[in-house]
Amino acid sequence: YNPNEYVHFRLSAGKGYRTNHVLAENNYLLSSSRKVEIAKGLDMEEAWNYGASVSTYVPVFGKTLNINAEYYYTDFLKQVVVDMDSNPHEVAFYNLDGRSYSHVFQVEASYPFFKGFTLTGAYRLTDAQTTYKGQRMEKPLTSKYKGLLTASYQTPLGIWQFDATFQLNGGGRMPVPYELANGQL
C-alpha cells in the first residue's frame, strides 16, 4: 500500500514447510565432543509467518534518506529442536513438544552524504524462544540484538568500492555447561 510517493507499507503472511537436515545444518556441534542423539521419526518443520514493513524516503538537503522498519513473527507448529541444555555431554535432536516462536524487529537508515559515499545504519532486536523438555527458554547462541554501521565509498568510475563496517552483537543465552547434582554447584 502506497499512501504517497514517499511511504510504502507491506504486509505478508504465509505458511512454510521445511525439511531439516540436522547434521548438515549443525555440523559445528560435531567438534564439541558431545554425544549426538537423533530421535527417530523427525517431522518436517511447519510454521506460520507474519510480517509488516514500512519504507519511507525523506528528502534531506537535495538527497534521499531511506528509512525501513520491519517486524516479522514466526510461530512454529512443528520444529526439530536442537537441545544442548538437557545434558551437557550430549546434543539431542527431537520434535517440538510445546511452543516455539520468533519475533524480529529491524530498523535501517541509509543516506548518501556526497557522491560515492553512503552511510548505512541498522539495528535488529530478536526474541526467539523454544520449549525444551517442557520448559520454554530463549534459543541458545542467538543474539538478542545486533547493530551495524557501514560507511561505503565508490570511486567516480565505479571500478573500486571501499567499505568500513562496525558491528555490535548483543549477548545471548549459552547452554548450561555443567550438571547440577542435588541442586548444588
Where are these regions (language model features)?
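Short, intrinsically disordered, charge-balanced linker/junction segments flanking boundaries
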Residues: Y1, E5, A164, E179-L185
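Residue-level signature of outer-membrane beta-barrel architecture
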Residues: Y1-P3, K15, M44, T56-V58, ...
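Signature of Gram-negative outer-membrane beta-barrel scaffolds
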Residues: Y1-V7, T19, L30
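Outer-membrane beta-barrel proteins
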Residues: K40-M44, K139
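Gram-negative outer-membrane beta-barrel transporters
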Residues: N66-L77, F93-Y178
